[in-house]
UniProtKB/Swiss-Prot annotation:
It is found in: Periplasm. Keywords: Periplasm, Signal. The keyword Transferase does not apply. PANTHER family: PROTEIN YCEI (PTHR34406:SF1). This is UPF0312 protein VC0395_0473/VC395_A0785. SUPFAM superfamilies: YceI-like. The lineage of its organism: Bacteria, Pseudomonadati, Pseudomonadota, Gammaproteobacteria, Vibrionales. Residues 1-22 form the signal peptide. The keyword Transferase does not apply. Disulfide bonds: none annotated. It holds the Pfam family YceI.
């Protein structure tokens, strides 16, 4: 009788699908599967686009409990690249982001809100130009699964608008803000 109860109990436990747990990921910058891009208005006539070439970070994601998710990203502001060396030098200067003095920008999430259908609201603190301010990133879960090398990956995209004055950065020409576009693919630890 004991053996029968144990067998039934074991069978019941094995047949229950395991709930997804939070998984920790490293942002895949080595494989160039992530990017931090920006767009700023140029003189009211067009947009300048660029990116930050050096950054790192990690995130925790639990599809069964989105609120338990978190993200931390560190950006080397000296790696700003708008595909124009003289302009990059000027943007990195004390006139704007002062990358020699403030070489790292950091984002740390404080809350992740599930908006439904893969849409997320990632709230957190951004430290840029020596100022820490709360921001919201509107994000989208792209997908997750096994990669061809036997690892697990998860990917997200997001956007946010940063008001330059909030971070003590002077207005760049016609634009008082910069739009950020983020693409993140993580490799599970």
């Amino acid at each position: 009788m004991k053996k029968t109860l144990m067998a039934v109990g074991l069978a019941a436990v094995i047949s229950i699908p395991f709930a997804a747990n939070a998984a920790d990921y490293v942002i895949d910058t080595k494989g160039a599967h992530a990017s931090i891009n920006f767009k700023v208005n140029h003189l009211g006539y067009s947009y300048i686009k660029g990116r930050f070439n050096k950054f790192d970070g990690e995130f925790s994601y639990d599809p069964a409990n989105i609120a338990a998710s978190s993200v931390v990203v560190n950006v080397d502001t000296r790696s700003l690249d708008s595909n124009h060396a003289e302009r990059d030098k000027h943007i990195r200067s004390a006139d704007f982001i002062d990358a020699s003095k403030y070489s790292t920008a950091t984002f740390k999430s404080t809350e992740v809100v599930d908006k439904g259908n893969g849409q997320l609201e990632v709230k957190g603190d951004l430290t840029l130009h020596g100022q820490t301010k709360p921001i919201v990133i509107n994000a989208e879960f792209i997908g997750a699964g096994q990669d061809p090398w036997g690892g697990q990956r998860a990917g997200f995209a997001g956007t946010t608008r940063l008001e330059l004055k909030d971070f003590g950065i002077q207005v760049m020409g016609a634009s008082s803000y910069v739009d950020m576009e983020l693409h993140v693919e993580g490799v599970q630890k």
